[in-house]
């Protein structure tokens, strides 16, 4: 079988296992891939994204990231970062402080806070989500 024939199998595979550098362990590649990422301006204007249908601006520093393809459940892991309007890094994307929205498989709630200054609309907000797709 040719290398091209082997590569052709990947799109239909339900699992891709990769050996570690030393070969002692394996990892499931699909489990390690980001299922969503988005880079947007504080006005909810999407600069670039993957699996992001849109951003909803719910108020200062409060956003809903709307997915293109649903996640399997709400037990996903999100991480994010932002730059505040003064250009200072260190803004935290958070989902546990004052947001009233509830996470779902199609909406990821994000709040942008800058240290002790409260909610802000960052100049550049970024989020990445790991989990299972539906």
Q: Which ranges hold each PLM region?
A:
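Extracellular receptor-binding modules and their adjoining Ser/Thr/Gly/Asp/Asn-rich linkers
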Residues: 2-4, 9-72, 114-134
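A detector of low-complexity, intrinsically disordered, Ser/Thr/Gly/Pro/Ala-rich segments
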Residues: 12-15, 24-25, 83, 95-98, ...
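Extracellular/virion structural assembly segments
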Residues: 70, 84-85
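Extracellular jelly-roll beta-sandwich "head" domains, especially the C-terminal globular C1q domain
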Residues: 86-134
């Amino acid at each position: 079988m040719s290398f091209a024939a082997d590569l052709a199998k990947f799109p239909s595979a339900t699992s891709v296992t990769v050996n570690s550098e030393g070969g002692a362990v394996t990892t499931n590649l699909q489990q390690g891939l980001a299922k969503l990422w988005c880079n947007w301006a504080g006005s909810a204007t999407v600069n670039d994204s993957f699996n992001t249908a849109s951003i909803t601006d719910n108020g200062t520093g409060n956003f809903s990231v709307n997915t293109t393809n649903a996640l399997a459940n709400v037990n996903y892991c999100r991480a994010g970062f932002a730059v505040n309007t003064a250009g200072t890094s260190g803004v935290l994307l958070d989902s546990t402080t004052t947001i009233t929205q509830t996470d779902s498989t199609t909406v990821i709630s994000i709040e942008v806070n800058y240290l002790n200054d409260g909610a802000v609309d960052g100049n550049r907000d970024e989020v990445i989500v790991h989990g299972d797709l539906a």
